A protein has these predicted regions:
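Glycine-/small-residue-enriched transmembrane alpha-helix faces in small-molecule transporters
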Residues: 1-38, 77, 84-85, 146-173, ...
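Loop-to-transmembrane-helix transition segments
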Residues: 7-18, 56, 60-86, 129, ...
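Helix-helix packing/entry segments at the starts of transmembrane helices
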Residues: 11, 39-42, 97-104, 171-192, ...
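Cytoplasmic-side transmembrane-helix entry/capping segments in multi-pass membrane proteins
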Residues: 13-14, 66-74, 121-133, 153-154, ...
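Hydrophobic/small/kink-forming positions within alpha-helical transmembrane segments
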Residues: 21, 25, 52, 76-84, ...
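C-terminal transmembrane-helix exit sites in multi-pass transporters
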Residues: 53-58, 105-127, 251-272
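Hydrophobic transmembrane alpha-helices of multi-pass small-molecule transport proteins
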Residues: 112, 124-142, 195, 248, ...
């Protein structure tokens, strides 16, 4: 007897929340000793190794159409930029703060889903955008200046959000023609090939220690592998809006783990602003939920 689709959908959502809550922490540890570009290559190499077995088993679930190939190329490029942005955002910053701000991916994806996939978006989405922006401003309330350096973390986190939102919309457009694991291996393979073609980067990879590879492996497992694959599977059972809103709660896990591992806690302004960001996302979710 087959598993109830609702149970499968819930399983993938819970798995996605856990992965998204964990992944910023090994990124943060890796950034203590590794350059961002080198880290991205290492993470993608590890994620590729994790993904190959499942993709090989499902290798026939790929429709070789020009549109699908073009989307895979776009997803690979966006994934490279997104992971580089993660590394830049986390350097010298809080993993929890990054995770909260990057949840803006949810609203960006809703808007992109409205534009390209014709998923419903109403007035509450735009109210949610205003609430989220207010929360971000409050989180940076101690540095409300026009100094770009003070906002570097926020800008990199928003870049991450935009890239991943586009990845999810593009992935959902071919979800029934390309299995998520096959898609993941193809985009990772392309990204690794492009990055290793950069002069000198392969040589820098050879200097990584076993400890460095351990943190990169954990970052790859929770990020490009488990986080992305489980999320893409979740899109088979849920709209982008519903699935991404569930991931809103992942920063709570990040906050807990960051305190346990790094002994770091957000300031009062950051906690209040982060809560406001999450409220804004839940406002957006209420809009999508009322439309079904």
């Amino acid at each position: 007897m087959g598993t109830d689709p609702r149970n499968r959908g819930m399983f993938f959502l819970v798995l996605t929340i856990f992965a998204h809550g964990c992944f910023p922490l090994p990124y943060a540890k890796a950034m203590q000793s590794i350059q961002p570009t080198v880290a991205v290559v290492g993470i993608f190499c590890c994620a590729l190794l994790f993904s190959i077995p499942g993709a090989w088993h499902l290798r026939r679930k790929f429709n070789f159409r020009l549109k699908n190939i073009a989307i895979i190329v776009a997803v690979a490029l966006l994934g490279m930029l997104a992971n580089y942005s993660i590394c830049q955002a986390i350097v010298g910053s809080s993993a929890t703060m990054f995770n909260v701000i990057s949840r803006a991916e949810i609203i960006i994806a809703m808007i992109l889903g409205w534009v390209y996939l014709h998923e419903h978006v109403g007035l509450r989405i735009w109210i949610a955008v205003a609430v989220v922006l207010s929360g971000i401003l409050l989180m940076r309330g101690d540095t409300l200046t026009f100094n770009l350096a003070d906002w570097e973390t926020v800008l990199w986190a928003l870049c991450t959000a935009g890239c991943f939102a586009a990845v999810q919309v593009l992935s959902k457009s071919i979800i029934h023609e390309v299995d998520p694991q096959v898609l993941n291996v193809l985009r990772l393979s392309l990204a690794v090939a492009l990055l290793l073609a950069v002069p000198g980067l392969a040589m820098e990879m050879s200097t990584l220690t076993l400890g460095d590879w351990g943190w990169l492996g954990l970052a790859a497992f929770f990020g490009p592998f488990l986080g992305r694959v489980s999320y893409t599977y979740a899109l088979r059972y849920h709209t982008i809006a519903r699935a991404m809103t569930a991931v809103t709660f992942s920063p709570v896990l990040t906050l807990l783990f960051e305190f346990l591992i790094f002994g770091r806690m957000l300031s009062a302004l950051e906690l209040i602003g982060g809560t406001l960001v999450m409220i804004g996302i839940l406002v957006a979710f209420r809009e999508t939920g009322s439309s079904h």
